[in-house]
UniProtKB/Swiss-Prot annotation:
Residues 477-486 have a biased composition (Pro residues). Residues 313-325, 459-476 have a biased composition (Low complexity). Residues 383-393 have a biased composition (Polar residues). GO terms for molecular function: phosphatidylinositol binding; small GTPase binding; ubiquitin binding. GO terms for biological process: Golgi to plasma membrane protein transport; Golgi to plasma membrane transport; intracellular protein transport; positive regulation of protein catabolic process; protein catabolic process; protein localization; protein localization to cell surface; protein localization to ciliary membrane. PANTHER family: ADP-RIBOSYLATION FACTOR-BINDING PROTEIN GGA1, GOLGI-LOCALIZED, GAMMA-ADAPTIN EAR CONTAINING, ARF BINDING PROTEIN. It comes from Mus musculus (Mouse). Belongs to the GGA protein family. Residues 114-273 are annotated as: Interaction with ARF3. The VHS domain functions as a recognition module for sorting signals composed of an acidic cluster followed by two leucines (DXXLL motif). The GAT domain is responsible for interaction with ARF-GTP, UBC and RABEP1. Required for recruitment to the TGN it prevents ARF-GTP hydrolysis. Keywords: Acetylation, Endosome, Golgi apparatus, Membrane, Phosphoprotein, Protein transport, Transport, Ubl conjugation. The lineage of its organism: Eukaryota, Metazoa, Chordata, Craniata, Vertebrata. This is ADP-ribosylation factor-binding protein GGA1. Residues 171-298 form the GAT domain.
Length: 635
């Protein structure tokens, strides 16, 4: 019985590729040598030793073939091989062939010219391999290189795209251990190496299964979303039959079942921002079509919004005031979380829902926001600003109006109507719209201004109303002039509150701020700026836990340089339960407002405090991965 054939070695392939009996270049053998070099873990160092021996052959044809193999490998084998060629150990073997002190007197001019041509082409194409350039310059100084050779067109090769990493060997520690075990001659080490290889292969198989599962799930979501959207739009035009309604209902139920699947996929997607962005987009589409079905087919309200109320002009509070010119406010007041009144469309609703967290699932959109205390801006690196208004010992600079400029706005009780909340917000924003001269007057000495509702503001946003003009006249001793240039005291954020539901996500990928101990904090950037405040960036801070223990007493604080201002609105909670992949997990979201009127490069310092088990963590760090300030108005 014939013994089983062993796989061909690199040495056998190089012998066949450089055989002196070859009538012409054996490109099949050359390419197979390059392919195996890429596949073998120890391929590059072994290949350079074999090539050095062949290049020093006294037979010119064998040496020329070896140099052709070397040139081909440099063009197709990537950085690992470049690093081996760029070592003095291999370069010295080439220098021996061209130097008269060694083999130069016995080497043909054709071989020496080819070596010098290769060295020069590598200095041009691989400037990062400095040792190659040093070797070539040394040959110049010794007079071996009289002038730079003229390179043929195919000598200056474009660098190949980076080869995809073999994930099995990405773990540096395991790779080093495996290399050490394979070099050992002890049977125990070889058995350990075999076991380690099996473990690494199994890990890679699990990773590939996760990727396949994610791709299939996203594809299924996109197909269901597309079909359900078409059927819902057809239903809204009155062209749907009873059978199509049953199909719509089935598609809707299928979309609902895909929500926890997307969340689990996001939980398994650890640090792959590109894959996470695909999941975000799929969930955004899923949420949009679910809300569209509820509104147009069932006629249900979605987060206080019904199709019947989605009429022109019935937009959210901030959009109602988009026509007003809001100069930087100079007053302070307690931050009051407001609830959205009406949404303009299902697209706005779904976009805001999709921004709430990294995983975008089960984030408690209907949970009541805890009442906030007085917020204060961060005045520098020494002051961390948090949602409860507490800071370090350095007090913030005094604002021009005192705190008693108007009655503090109380958090609306659960039974209050949405219009009352919007009217209160309308009054607040109207006072912000006053010029700085009018805000310098102490309000307690004036007669209270008539309370304008949000609808009044909407109808009069294009031109100042007589009431507003009289208000300016009675409160300002001088006629208002052009608004002055913004100063550090005029871009306060304390009177601005952005409802989470009104935020739309941008196309920028989220930034991971903190990811340790199973606790993850991310920054999501809003697409639209605040009306009249293009210097303000709206960020949603998302906190999610995959830890096996509950996380309590979570506090996120932030600070920026003194030329900027930062404010954190109250978080949606301070505790996260232990992670359970079966049930929908909780998450914490918090709106961060960042004012940067001078458009400086942003560097934010954060402090994160939380308790996990019996241990309290106090983490600090910096974040500078913000969009360029000049693009804040159109992310």
């Amino acid at each position: 019985m014939e013994p089983a054939m062993e796989p061909e070695t690199l040495e056998a392939r190089i012998n066949r590729a450089t055989n002196p009996l070859n009538k012409e270049l054996n490109w099949a053998s050359i390419n197979s040598f390059c392919e195996q070099l890429n596949e073998d873990f120890e391929g590059p160092p072994l290949a350079t030793r074999l090539l050095a021996h062949k290049i020093q052959s006294p037979q010119e044809w064998e040496a020329i073939q070896a140099l052709t193999v070397l040139e081909t490998c440099m063009k197709s084998c990537g950085k690992r091989f470049h690093d081996e060629v760029g070592k003095f150990r291999f370069l010295n073997e080439l220098i021996k062939v061209v130097s008269p002190k060694y083999l130069g007197s016995r080497t043909s001019e054709k071989v020496k010219s080819k070596i010098l041509e290769l060295l020069y082409s590598w200095t041009v194409c691989l400037p990062e391999e400095v040792k190659i350039a040093e070797a070539y310059q040394m040959l110049k100084k010794q007079g071996i290189v009289k002038s730079d050779p003229k390179l043929p067109e195919d000598a200056i090769f474009p660098l190949p795209p980076p080869r995809p990493k073999n994930v099995i060997f990405e773990d540096e520690e395991k790779s080093k251990m495996l290399a050490r075990l394979l070099k050992s001659s002890h049977p125990e080490d070889l058995r350990a190496a075999n076991k380690l290889i099996k473990e690494m292969v199994q890990e890679d198989q699990k990773r590939m299964e996760k990727i396949s599962k994610r791709v299939n799930a996203i594809e299924e979501v996109n197909n269901n979303v597309k079909l359900l959207t078409e059927m819902v739009m057809s239903h809204s035009q009155g062209a749907a039959s009873s059978s199509s309604e049953d199909l719509m209902k089935e598609l809707y139920q299928r979309c609902e079942r895909m929500r926890p699947t997307l969340f689990r996929l996001a939980s398994d997607t650890e640090d792959n921002d590109e894959a996470l962005a695909e999941i975000l987009q799929a969930n955004d589409n899923l949420t949009q079509v679910i809300n569209l079905y509820k509104q147009l087919v069932r006629g249900e309200e979605v987060n206080g919004d019904a199709t019947a109320s989605s009429i022109p002009g019935s937009t959210s509070a901030l959009l109602d005031l988009s026509g007003l010119d809001l100069p930087p406010p100079g007053t302070t007041q307690p931050a009051t979380p407001t609830r959205p009144g009406n949404q303009s469309s299902p697209e706005q609703l779904s976009a805001s829902v999709s921004l709430l967290d990294d995983e975008l699932m089960s984030l408690g959109l209907s949970d009541p926001t805890p009442p906030s205390g007085t917020s204060s801006d961060s005045v520098g690196w020494d002051n961390f600003q948090s949602s409860d208004g507490t800071e370090s010992s350095v007090p913030p600079p005094a604002q021009a109006p005192s705190m008693d400029c108007r009655p503090p706005a109380q958090a609306p009780p659960p039974t209050s109507s949405g219009l009352d909340d919007l009217d209160l917000l309308g009054k607040t924003l109207m006072q912000q719209a006053l010029p700085p001269e009018a805000q310098q007057v102490r309000w307690e000495k004036q007669q209270p201004a008539p309370r304008l509702t949000l609808r009044d503001l909407q109808s009069k946003s294009s031109s100042p109303s007589p009431g507003a003009a009289s208000l300016l006249h009675t409160t300002s001793p001088e006629p208002p002039g052009p608004p002055p240039q913004a100063t550090p005291t005029e871009f306060s954020l304390t009177s601005i509150t952005v409802p989470l539901e009104s935020i739309k996500p941008s196309s920028i990928l989220p930034v991971t701020v903190y990811d340790q101990h199973g606790f993850r904090v991310l920054f999501h950037f809003a697409r639209d700026p605040l009306p009249g405040r293009s210097d303000v960036l709206v960020v949603v801070v998302s906190m999610l836990s995959t830890a096996p223990q509950p996380i309590r007493n979570i506090v996120f604080q932030s600070a920026v340089p003194k030329v900027m201002k930062v404010r954190l609105q109250p978080p949606s909670g301070t505790e996260l339960p232990a992670f359970n992949p079966i049930v929908h997990p909780s998450a914490i979201t918090q709106v961060l407002l960042l004012a940067n009127p001078q458009k400086e490069k942003v560097r934010l310092r954060y402090k994160l405090i939380f308790t996990m088990g019996d241990q309290t963590y106090n983490e600090m760090g910096d974040v500078d991965q913000f969009p360029p300030p000049e693009t804040w108005g159109s992310l």
